[in-house]
Amino acid sequence: MTKTIYVLNGPNLNLLGTREPDIYGHHTLADVEALCRETAARFGLEAVCHQTNREGEIVDLIHEAAKKQAAGLIINGGGYSHTSVAIHDAIVGVQIPTVEVHVSNVYARERFRHQSFIAKAAFATLCGFGIEGYRLAILGLAARIGLAAKT
């Protein structure tokens, strides 16, 4: 049975490629999802990708990941990273190894973006690598759960 990881993208990430390309680049959400699926497959993992603009749906997807015994979670909470205690609590509650990802370097941006509730629940945070951060997150997650790349 193939292990799964959930890749969750929060509000406005459906606009990747068109929203503020000077900050977020020209890659689309479809590019992110393809990158995640390809990278996960190198480790014998299946990446289950979701994007939603609704906080409660993110919480529900985190619960679903636990119910389906996902091996890990990659999350870009978008703006909810800085505001959502509910998402933090969901991650803590399910105890799935989690990596937080941000396309931009949140620490080079507005001060309110320097605080992340998700980071406090994740074992790692990556920011500023563009969509490459998702690949790096999967590499780190695979190492954390003891998987090596398949040749």
Curated annotation (Swiss-Prot):
The gene is aroQ. It comes from Afipia carboxidovorans (strain ATCC 49405 / DSM 1227 / KCTC 32145 / OM5). Pfam families: DHquinase_II (PF01220). Homododecamer. GO terms for biological process: amino acid biosynthetic process; aromatic amino acid family biosynthetic process; chorismate biosynthetic process; quinate catabolic process. Pathway: Metabolic intermediate biosynthesis; chorismate biosynthesis; chorismate from D-erythrose 4-phosphate and phosphoenolpyruvate: step 3/7. The record marks R19 as: Transition state stabilizer. Keywords: Amino-acid biosynthesis, Aromatic amino acid biosynthesis, Lyase. Catalyzes a trans-dehydration via an enolate intermediate. This is 3-dehydroquinate dehydratase. SUPFAM superfamilies: Type II 3-dehydroquinate dehydratase (SSF52304). The active site is at Y24 (proton acceptor), H102 (proton donor). One of its GO terms (molecular function) is 3-dehydroquinate dehydratase activity. Substrate binds at N76, H82, D89, V103, S104, R113. Its EC number is 4.2.1.10. The keyword Lyase applies. Gene3D superfamilies: Dehydroquinase, class II. CDD domains: DHQase_II.
